[in-house]
């Protein structure tokens, strides 16, 4: 009975508490509305209600479809290696003169924007974080960097949004995005129109800042409701020194190699020292190198945050080619943005290592298993970079120093089968974006159907381990000391020194050597061209006699007639060495042959056969 009354009391208190809160909220609501507090740039419409979850009105899906005409509005340049503090912006005006460089960096021509860039939008469903403020995203990335794995977020932190995204089923729209990526090689020569977003130095007089860093081109439609960020991809030059090729190679080998260019060809450029043994590496060391502030991914995050400050309410799309396409996809996975890439390097490997947020039910170590990412990767089967096969010993990528070992894409792949359809051979020359536009995108009547990649894994031969990041490399040297003791010698005083030593009398040393040898004594009766043709008749074992050698004993103790090279006094030896030769048969030949052998008539001799003891 008491228990039942207690439950009723608790229920009444909860009901009273909830009613009191609603009454207080209704009383404070007019005051909140009348307040003139400045709105925050990160505020959302549902932030004013602390009790009810945000109710997003369901829009008509037909309103998400439309046509957009884009124009180039800005060029952002984010420094990395040589100028890590550099971040500049060039606003495109009607009088701005731009130049387009060829993909090999040798030719240039004036840029023309007469052809409109038209793309269609289509509803796209993306599973992304509900709170996508840059400060919140940075907290998730920092936690992943400190712990070594992606942050574990609850299911309530994720939303399934349907928004207006690029129509990847429309050929003209796909061509428009490809042309945007081709224009990523635009440079502005000899102008002072660049604005410093932040930076401690004046780079207007520097000639090298444009060759260092990541460049992004910002396209916007007429209403500024949709913008496209296009990131610059890898230049095709194989050797260092052409524009940003050196930095591109460092980032390629850092993000898309199993261990920073280690453990493979000696031609690969190594960008870290994290390998500990054959196919074994320190994953913590690799992740720390990838998160350095002078890397392209960090530059892409900074570039995106500055672009969204200019267009805070715009719908953002991403596009890029090659390395720029991979950075585009990583940026899209981070913020939940639709991305369209062309011939992008497989980027699932760096996505897993960077610790990008992953929704519940998905393994963060396998981002290629995620669905609803909004990423679409266009490419063809003759491109070894896109297919993840540009890593063999004889491949052009290897000879150029690139270690592209990753093979898995996130999102969906839209593949043109140029090998079967056109009989193309796999070659690096088909990777260039202008060749892709003219020979693939414009030639095919329809775009391929996009589908996720199935059963793909990276670096299966490698073993990775984690550490606390405080290890340092030590070298152990083992020194072996060998002490040699010289043999004992007798020391005496030389009474008669000479020019080349002491002339005192020497001592007598007797050396006795005893050995047993087996000899064969025969007489050749039938000599041949290449030796004796007689059969072996007997074998006699004879012990070798002892050999005794006696050194002469000098009788003189003083030198009466010293010379330049010794004493000229006569010496008298006390003994003479004797040597007893071993017994043997002696046969003389009276008629020798012209070349070898003996022509004497055959003689018969008896040889007794003895039995060995």
Curated annotation (Swiss-Prot):
One of its GO terms (molecular function) is triacylglycerol lipase activity. It is found in: Endosome, Multivesicular body membrane; Prevacuolar compartment membrane. Residues 472-492 are annotated as: Disordered. Its EC number is 3.1.1.3. Pfam families: Lipase_3. Keywords: Autophagy, Endosome, Glycoprotein, Hydrolase, Lipid degradation, Lipid metabolism, Membrane, Signal-anchor, Transmembrane, Transmembrane helix. It catalyses: a triacylglycerol + H2O = a diacylglycerol + a fatty acid + H(+). It is a single-pass type II membrane protein. Residues 473-492 have a biased composition (Low complexity). The active site is at residue 322. The keyword ATP-binding does not apply. Residues 1-20 are cytoplasmic. Glycans are attached at residues 202, 224, 282, 306, 468. Residues 44-613 are lumenal. One of its GO terms (biological process) is piecemeal microautophagy of the nucleus. The chain crosses the membrane at residues 21-43. InterPro entries: AB_hydrolase_fold, ATG15_Lipase, Fungal_lipase-type. SUPFAM superfamilies: alpha/beta-Hydrolases (SSF53474). It is an enzyme of class 3 (hydrolase). One of its GO terms (cellular component) is vacuolar lumen. Belongs to the AB hydrolase superfamily. Lipase family. Lipase which is essential for lysis of subvacuolar cytoplasm to vacuole targeted bodies and intravacuolar autophagic bodies. Involved in the lysis of intravacuolar multivesicular body (MVB) vesicles. The intravacuolar membrane disintegration by atg15 is critical to life span extension. Binds to both phosphatidylinositol (PI) and phosphatidylinositol 3,5-bisphosphate (PIP2). This is Putative lipase atg15. It comes from Aspergillus terreus (strain NIH 2624 / FGSC A1156). The lineage of its organism: Eukaryota, Fungi, Dikarya, Ascomycota, Pezizomycotina. The gene is atg15.
């Amino acid at each position: 009975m008491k228990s039942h009354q207690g439950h009723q009391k608790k229920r009444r208190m909860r009901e009273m508490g909830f009613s009191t809160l609603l009454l207080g909220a209704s009383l404070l609501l007019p005051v909140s509305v009348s307040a003139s507090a400045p709105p925050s740039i990160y505020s959302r419409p549902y932030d004013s209600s602390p009790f009810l979850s945000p109710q997003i009105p369901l829009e008509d899906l037909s309103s998400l479809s439309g046509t957009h005409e884009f124009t180039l509005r800005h060029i952002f340049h984010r420094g990395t290696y040589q100028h890590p503090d550099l971040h500049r912006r060039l606003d495109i005006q009607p009088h701005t003169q731009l130049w387009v460089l060829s993909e090999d960096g040798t030719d240039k021509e004036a840029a023309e924007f007469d052809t409109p860039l038209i793309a269609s939008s289509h509803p796209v469903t993306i599973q992304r974080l509900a709170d996508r403020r840059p400060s919140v995203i940075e907290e998730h990335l920092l936690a992943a960097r400190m712990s070594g794995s992606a942050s574990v977020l609850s299911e309530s932190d994720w939303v399934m949004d349907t928004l207006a995204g690029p129509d990847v089923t429309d050929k003209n729209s796909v061509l428009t995005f490809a042309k945007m990526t081709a224009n990523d090689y635009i440079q502005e020569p000899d102008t002072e129109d660049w604005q410093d977003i932040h930076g401690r130095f004046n780079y207007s007089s520097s000639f090298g800042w444009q060759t260092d860093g990541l460049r992004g081109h910002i396209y916007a439609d007429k209403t500024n409701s949709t913008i496209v960020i296009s990131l610059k991809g890898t230049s095709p030059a194989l050797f260092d020194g052409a524009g940003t090729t050196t930095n591109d190679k460092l980032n390629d080998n850092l993000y898309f190699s199993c261990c920073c260019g280690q453990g493979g060809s000696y031609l690969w450029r190594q960008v870290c020292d994290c390998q500990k043994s054959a196919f074994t590496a320190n994953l913590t060391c690799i992740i720390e190198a990838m998160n350095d502030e002078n890397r392209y991914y960090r530059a892409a995050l900074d570039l995106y945050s500055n672009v969204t400050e200019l267009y805070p309410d715009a719908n953002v799309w991403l596009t890029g080619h090659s390395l720029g396409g991979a950075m585009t996809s990583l940026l899209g996975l981070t913020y939940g943005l639709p991305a369209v890439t062309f011939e992008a390097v497989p980027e699932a490997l760096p996505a897993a290592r960077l610790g990008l947020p992953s929704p519940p039910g998905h393994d963060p170590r396998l981002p290629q298993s995620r669905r609803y990412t909004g990423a679409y990767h266009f490419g063809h089967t003759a491109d070894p970079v896109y297919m993840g096969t540009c890593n063999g010993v004889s491949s052009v990528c290897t000879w150029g120093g690139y270690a592209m070992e990753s093979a898995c894409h996130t999102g969906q792949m839209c593949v043109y089968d140029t090998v079967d359809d056109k009989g193309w051979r796999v070659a690096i020359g088909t990777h260039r974006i202008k060749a892709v536009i003219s020979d693939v995108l414009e030639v095919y009547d329809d775009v391929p159907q996009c589908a996720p990649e199935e059963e793909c894994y990276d670096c299966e031969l490698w073993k990775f381990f984690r550490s606390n990041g405080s290890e340092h490399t030590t070298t152990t040297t083992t020194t072996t000391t060998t002490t040699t003791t010289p043999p004992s010698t007798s020391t005496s005083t030389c009474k008669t020194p000479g020019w080349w030593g002491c002339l005192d009398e020497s001592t007598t040393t007797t050396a006795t050597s005893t050995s047993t040898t087996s000899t064969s004594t025969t007489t050749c009766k039938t000599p041949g061209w290449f030796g004796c043709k007689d059969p072996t008749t007997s074998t006699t074992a004879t012990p070798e006699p002892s050999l005794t050698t006696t050194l002469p004993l000098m009788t003189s103790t003083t030198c009466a007639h010293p010379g330049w090279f010794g004493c000229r006094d006569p010496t008298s030896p006390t003994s003479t060495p004797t040597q007893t030769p071993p017994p043997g048969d002696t046969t003389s030949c009276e008629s020798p042959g012209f070349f070898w052998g003996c022509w004497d008539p055959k003689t018969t001799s008896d040889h007794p056969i003895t039995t060995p003891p």
